[in-house]
Amino acid sequence: MSSREIRIATRKSALALWQAEYVKARLEAAHPGLLVTLVPMVSRGDKLLDSPLSKIGGKGLFVKELETALLENEADIAVHSMKDVPMDFPEGLGLFCICEREDPRDAFVSNTYSSLDALPAGSIVGTSSLRRQAQLLTRRPDLEIRFLRGNVNTRLAKLDAGEYDAIILAAAGLIRLGFEDRITSAISVDDSLPAGGQGAVGIECRSADTEIHALLAPLHHADTADRVTAERALNKHLNGGCQVPIACYAVLEGDQLWLRGLVGEPSGGKLLNAQARAPRAAAETLGVQVAEDLLSQGADDILKAVYGEAGHE
């Protein structure tokens, strides 16, 4: 193995590069002598920063270019934020490793106010996520939600410039980039259910490349993988991409998985909730079960309306 090289396809954002460097360090620690190099590239989602993610659409906005690199043998693995990974993979590719999850919660960031509850009526809150928006406006319909895109540094700079009273970001990204001190308060999953896979890093590679699969095995975290499998099964059954108002979060209780799911109107008008428990071996079935519960409550109507507004499927 000492002469083997692994090329990692990654986006060029600071967070994506952190994740790729993390995987590189883990691989080098597990396999001394292994040569690991990064192949940075720009995704469509990185280029289109002037529109809400829900408008420019679709699934795989941040991964397609990386998958092309794998298919054309320009890279051996691709490192992704699991919340950005589509449910289906191109023929010949698959997800072969999920690393241990960082804090999956959303983070409240403000220079003035201590928490969501402390925000006065009419406060301006920045987020690009319909999932966060739906839950936030259900809880606080007196707030004004404004579009916020860009990398973590850009978003923090906009807050510091006074464009927003507060912004909502994934806690994991702030922690990984050394901005943990900017987290004013972590938002309980009871108040803002995370996106499926939030806080987890996944590794995609060619399905036939068994040598790479073996090298990745020490990085795989079974507890995280089972939780994320249930979350992704819910998302897939709802035909959800990463830019729709779907939230889902699974926790392990011994050998049982507890999965909570949510679909909400971006306006905060309606929020549907469902939950169930099952053995961890039945993670996919559990995801489908909770998704079916949401569909029986009318989730499909909410999601069709969102897709119609975005102009894509």
Curated annotation (Swiss-Prot):
UniProt entry keywords in alphabetical sequence: Porphyrin biosynthesis, Transferase
Record pathway: Porphyrin-containing compound metabolism; protoporphyrin-IX biosynthesis; coproporphyrinogen-III from 5-aminolevulinate: step 2/4
GO CC term (a single one): cytoplasm
EC number(s) given by UniProt: 2.5.1.61
Cofactor notes: Binds 1 dipyrromethane group covalently.
Single GO term (MF): hydroxymethylbilane synthase activity
Pfam families named among the record's database cross-references: Porphobil_deam (PF01379), Porphobil_deamC (PF03900)
S-(dipyrrolylmethanemethyl)cysteine, modified sites: C242
Superkingdom of source: Bacteria
Cofactor field: dipyrromethane
Gene3D superfamilies, per the entry: Periplasmic binding protein-like II, Porphobilinogen deaminase, C-terminal domain
InterPro entries reported for this sequence: HemC, Porphobilin_deaminase_cofac_BS, Porphobilin_deaminase_N, Porphobilinogen_deaminase_C, Porphobilinogen_deaminase_C_sf
GO biological-process terms attached to the record: protoporphyrinogen IX biosynthetic process
Reactions listed under catalytic activity: 4 porphobilinogen + H2O = hydroxymethylbilane + 4 NH4(+)
Subunit structure, as described in the record: Monomer.
Family recorded in the similarity comment: Belongs to the HMBS family.
Note: The porphobilinogen subunits are added to the dipyrromethane group.
Protein task: Tetrapolymerization of the monopyrrole PBG into the hydroxymethylbilane pre-uroporphyrinogen in several discrete steps.
Protein name, entry field: Porphobilinogen deaminase
Organism encoding this protein: Pseudomonas fluorescens (strain Pf0-1)
